Amino acid sequence: MINWQVIGQLTSLAMIVLVGPAVIVVLSLRKGDL
């Protein structure tokens, strides 16, 4: 049995962990350009 709820939570958590730092870097670079 595959627990899709757990997989969904892990996927969303991984997306937040991976996308979070990228967004911060992009914002800092844009502020640096301005």
Swiss-Prot record:
Keyword flag Zinc: no
Annotated membrane topology: Single-pass membrane protein
GO CC, one annotated term: photosystem II
NCBIfam families linked: PRK13686.1
Protein name: Photosystem II reaction center protein Psb30
GO biological process: photosynthesis
Function description: A core subunit of photosystem II (PSII), probably helps stabilize the reaction center.
UniProt entry keywords in alphabetical sequence: Chloroplast, Membrane, Photosynthesis, Photosystem II, Plastid, Thylakoid, Transmembrane, Transmembrane helix
Subcellular location: Plastid, Chloroplast thylakoid membrane
Oligomer status and interactors: PSII is composed of 1 copy each of membrane proteins PsbA, PsbB, PsbC, PsbD, PsbE, PsbF, PsbH, PsbI, PsbJ, PsbK, PsbL, PsbM, PsbT, PsbX, PsbY, PsbZ, Psb30/Ycf12, peripheral proteins of the oxygen-evolving complex and a large number of cofactors. It forms dimeric complexes.
Entry's transmembrane regions: 6-26
Entry's family note: Belongs to the Psb30/Ycf12 family.
Superkingdom, natural source: Eukaryota
